[in-house]
């Protein structure tokens, strides 16, 4: 049975956004490993972060409410991919840093300085509700007076860094069949103290679908460098076709340049056309072939992006090789048989 994110935060289904925020504050403070040394606190802290990540996002929450964890994470109610709103495909995996989420939630401040920093900070406090001793509004800290001006209480609004773009080069064979690409990135992450920074390597997995067009963008939200003053940039991979030694791509069609002699162009020929999946198709031509002429082999191109069970065409583009010179006897014959 899948996870119940509402149960993780101690909420009932239908909880409001404010109730979700308050539940995250309460549970995150209770199980933060800096204060809770019990076995399993670290894992519980991660589960709380994942639950908040889902329930605080309207789209993820809608899918979870309809299909549960299995549908959210891609297994779907009938073994298919997770269903999003309006039937769109959606697959979720929690990649967040629970400590960074905690620090960002509290605006880069350490809430333990307020609630647990003094010797008597925990006296009379309900461990299940560390905010119970404070006159709080529905928003959390909004009505608490810590002896500072309101402007000092409110952290500066963070801005997200511009997207970081990388090329993702794929071969035509990979576009034909689909493939999985694993891209290693290095980025900076906040440590649990919310101030110091560590370098971290991460593997990003990209499922390249059949027929994807050049220029397709794959975005990994907030995987850029993180500091206490920014929202990490999105990492964006842009699909680029690798040059092919035989074919050229034209959307979902592939172009095969066929070099034939002048004699073949005039008298007819058979062209053995290779395909992306390794087959060879003999194509017979009986009519005169002009330089630059194109002929289609239907359905032998790349899969169509939206309907990959269908395919584009393989286009034969002719290049006619003319002889450097013609003997006089042959020239005489040609003059007699060729039309003016």
UniProtKB/Swiss-Prot annotation:
Subunit-structure text: Interacts with DNAJC3. Interacts with HSF1 (via transactivation domain); this interaction results in the inhibition of heat shock- and HSF1-induced transcriptional activity during the attenuation and recovery phase period of the heat shock response. Interacts with BAG3.
Cited function: Interacts with HSP70 and can stimulate its ATPase activity. Stimulates the association between HSC70 and HIP. Negatively regulates heat shock-induced HSF1 transcriptional activity during the attenuation and recovery phase period of the heat shock response. Stimulates ATP hydrolysis and the folding of unfolded proteins mediated by HSPA1A/B (in vitro).
Main location: cytoplasm
PANTHER family in UniProt: DNAJ HOMOLOG SUBFAMILY B MEMBER 1 (PTHR24078:SF568), DNAJ HOMOLOG SUBFAMILY C MEMBER (PTHR24078)
Induction: By heat shock.
Protein name: DnaJ homolog subfamily B member 1
Protein localization: Cytoplasm; Nucleus; Nucleus, Nucleolus
Signal peptide stretch: none
Any one GO CC term of the record: dendritic spine
Record GO biological process: cellular response to heat; chaperone cofactor-dependent protein refolding; forebrain development; negative regulation of inclusion body assembly; negative regulation of transcription by RNA polymerase II; positive regulation of chaperone-mediated protein folding; regulation of cellular response to heat; response to unfolded protein
Residue numbers bearing the Phosphothreonine modification: 307
Domain J: 2-70
GO molecular function, one term: transcription corepressor activity
SMART domains: DnaJ
CDD domains the UniProt entry points to: DnaJ (cd06257), DnaJ_C (cd10747)
């Amino acid at each position: 049975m899948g996870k119940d994110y509402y149960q993780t935060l101690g909420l009932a289904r239908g909880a409001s956004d404010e109730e979700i925020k308050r539940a995250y504050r309460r549970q995150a403070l209770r199980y933060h490993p800096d204060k809770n040394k019990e076995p399993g606190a670290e894992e519980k802290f991660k589960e709380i972060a994942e639950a908040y990540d889902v329930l605080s996002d309207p789209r993820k929450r809608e899918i979870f409410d309809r299909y549960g964890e299995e549908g959210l994470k891609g297994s779907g109610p009938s073994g298919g991919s997770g269903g999003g709103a309006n039937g769109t495909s959606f697959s979720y995996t929690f990649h967040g840093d629970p400590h960074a989420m905690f620090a960002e939630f509290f605006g880069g401040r350490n809430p333990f300085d307020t609630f647990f920093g003094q010797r008597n900070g925990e006296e009379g406090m309900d461990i299940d509700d560390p905010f119970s001793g404070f006159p709080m509004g529905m928003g959390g800290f909004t009505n608490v007076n810590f002896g500072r001006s309101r402007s000092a209480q409110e952290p500066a609004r963070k801005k997200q860094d511009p997207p970081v773009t990388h090329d993702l080069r794929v071969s035509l064979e990979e576009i034909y069949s689909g493939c999985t690409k694993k891209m290693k990135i290095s980025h900076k992450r906040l440590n649990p103290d919310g101030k110091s920074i560590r370098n971290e390597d991460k593997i990003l997995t990209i499922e390249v679908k059949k027929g994807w067009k050049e220029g397709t963008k794959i975005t990994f939200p907030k995987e850029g460098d993180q500091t206490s003053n920014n929202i990490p940039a999105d990492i964006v991979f842009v699909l680029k076709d690798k040059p092919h030694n035989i074919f050229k791509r034209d959307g979902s069609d592939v172009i095969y340049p066929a070099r034939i002699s002048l004699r073949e162009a005039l008298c007819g020929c058979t062209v053995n056309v290779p395909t992306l999946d390794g087959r060879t198709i003999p194509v017979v031509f009986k009519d005169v072939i002009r330089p630059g002429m194109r002929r289609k082999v239907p359905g032998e191109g790349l899969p169509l992006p939206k309907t990959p069970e269908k395919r584009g065409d393989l286009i034969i583009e002719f290049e006619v090789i003319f002889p450097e010179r013609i003997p006089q006897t042959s020239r005489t014959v040609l003059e007699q048989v060729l039309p003016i």
